Amino acid sequence: YVDSTQGWRPTDASTAAAITETNIFISATVSGACNTLTTCGDYKIATFTGPGTFCVSAAGGPVAVADYLVLAGGGGGGPDHGGAGGAGGFRESYCATTSGSYTASPLATPTSLPVSITAYPITTGSGGTGGSATPDCGARGNSSIFSSITSTGGGGIKSPNISMTGGSGASGVGQGGPGVGGAGNTPPVSPPQGNNGGNSQATANYAGGGGGGAGGVGGVGGAPQRTGGAGGAGTTTSINGTPTVRASGGSGGGSSPGTSTPATPGGGGRGGAGATQSGNGTDNTGGG
């Protein structure tokens, strides 16, 4: 590469003709409210926080691939001393020859996604609504989609005693007896998109487990007594140029005299206890 005026020139032939026949990198635009296309060094980062389109206008060169982070909406937790929602599915790719040098999450696959000249519709999954009072339930998070990559919404609470599966599973519920956390990485993909929700202990503890996170299972509810389990750990990636923790599970709800359980870094909401309300997950993080 010479400069912005002369562009790319061959070095293995006795000619100084500029290369014009082949697009070396892909060119693309984004559409949709609040969606952005920014520059980070020699690379472009397309960020979607709402529905839109990733429109590729040139992809004929040797680098017709893109790396991605597809993050689904977290699940909603249950009411009272209920279980917590699981984090939304977390799926990432990273290949240095595609996207340069940055630190990806431990969950990243080394296989970038091939792209062609077309418009790719983007689906951004919203978080599930939490239950406000028994028998209200926490809704499953919504899935996010880019091309062939689907991240599944986090598990919610199906009934006072049943936890849903999802990208990361919802936790066991602390009402009516011990509860088993929902399964994460459902449907299964490799690398896994999430982890199981935490279990809850016997009825006398009245505390839900923590929702599963991208980086770990949810904590057990009722240990210590009447205190909700911690949300499962999120995971860190620098795909946007800044190390950021995303996709932690929500913390489970407890009951008096237990204490509220703090939010786990990565967007998951805190767990309430007694007069302390539970907290919502943070927008655009995939937290439960």
What is each PLM-predicted segment?
Residues 1-288:
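Glycine-biased low-complexity/repetitive sequence motifs
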